Swiss-Prot record:
Binding, [2Fe-2S] cluster: C91, C96, C99, C111
Residues holding [4Fe-4S] cluster: C184, C187, C190, C251
Protein name per UniProt: Succinate dehydrogenase [ubiquinone] iron-sulfur subunit, mitochondrial
GO MF terms held by the record: 2 iron, 2 sulfur cluster binding; 3 iron, 4 sulfur cluster binding; 4 iron, 4 sulfur cluster binding; electron transfer activity; metal ion binding; succinate dehydrogenase (quinone) activity; ubiquinone binding
EC numbers for this chain: 1.3.5.1
Pathway annotation: Carbohydrate metabolism; tricarboxylic acid cycle; fumarate from succinate (eukaryal route): step 1/1
An annotated GO BP: tricarboxylic acid cycle
Protein's organism: Caenorhabditis briggsae
Length: 282
């Protein structure tokens, strides 16, 4: 009985030591000795760990051995220090919007955000604010994408069309109206910087989705502008925007969601109307 108890205690000690070693493995890293060592404070959260709570973990990166962008540092940390660090990324060119996160207090894309070369200050990296976190720097985008789907982002016609029978032409002026709208990459930087979206995401569509809604409302080839506007004619969908302008300030593509929302409000209140489609010259 005593031997069995001793064996149990010894096994428990081994398990505890193993747990401590595992928890410290991610934090352990070689001491950097270069001249340009930059500290990154990164949000960590693993929902699969029992009783998991968010923490901030520090990583030191030698900038002389790293690329110039935040995403370069994250990839270096994941490849060389902690393979459990989780984040989204794809194009590395500011096109796909996958690597959107909060860097130094501002929402932006990690692939086009340059590392602050001032090594006396650390750089703080968090997931996009006010969204559920899947793991580490990966936010849950399900609600955002569902809202995007709700605006039916495709051309809708009231006249029957046979694919390939004819083209839907636009004049130069009609096409110009889409500039500054279609370039949105749906990264959600603007929506997650908006206080109205923080507190009313279940009802307020948010800057990114509203800008895309306006893009389809104003498209001269679309015949369902009134129906699209009708779906937004309530107290929350568009009018919850209080023109704080965070969305326009933070957009990594330098678009102006606030202006698009203002145009939607003008259409909803009757101050403006959608221009009639120009007769085709083709």
């Amino acid at each position: 009985m005593l031997a069995r108890s001793a064996l149990f205690v010894h096994s428990a000690e081994l398990a505890a030591n193993a747990a401590r070693a595992a928890s410290g493995a991610a934090a352990a890293q070689p001491k950097k000795t270069g001249n340009r060592i930059k500290t990154f404070e990164i949000y960590r959260f693993n929902p699969e760990a029992p009783g998991a709570k968010p923490t901030i973990q520090k990583f030191d990166v030698d900038l002389d051995q790293c690329g110039t962008m935040i995403l370069d540092a994250l990839i270096k940390i994941k490849n060389e220090v902690d393979p459990t660090l989780t984040f989204r990324r794809s194009c590395r060119e500011g096109i796909c919007g996958s690597c959107a996160m909060n860097i130094g207090g501002e929402n932006t894309l990690a692939c086009i955000c340059k590392i602050d070369a001032d090594t006396s200050k650390s750089t703080k990296i968090y997931p996009l604010p006010h969204m559920f976190v899947v793991k580490d720097l990966v936010p849950d985008m399900n609600l955002f994408y569902a809202q995007y789907a709700s605006i039916q982002p495709w051309i809708q016609k009231k006249t029957p069309l046979t694919l390939g029978e004819k083209q839907m032409h636009q004049s130069v002026a009609e096409r110009d109206r889409l500039d500054g709208l279609y370039e949105c990459i749906l990264c959600a930087c603007c929506s997650t910087s908006c206080p109205s979206y923080w507190w009313n995401a279940d009802k307020y569509l948010g800057p990114a989705v509203l800008m895309q809604a306006y893009r389809w409302v104003i498209d001269s080839r679309d015949d369902y502008a009134q129906e699209r506007l009708h779906r937004m004619h309530d107290s929350f969908s568009a009018f919850k925007c209080h023109t704080i302008m965070n969305c326009t300030k933070t957009c990594p593509k330098h678009l102006n969601p606030a202006k698009a929302i203002g145009e939607i409000k003008s259409l909803l209140t009757g101050f403006k109307s959608k221009p009639a489609a120009e007769p085709s010259a083709f």
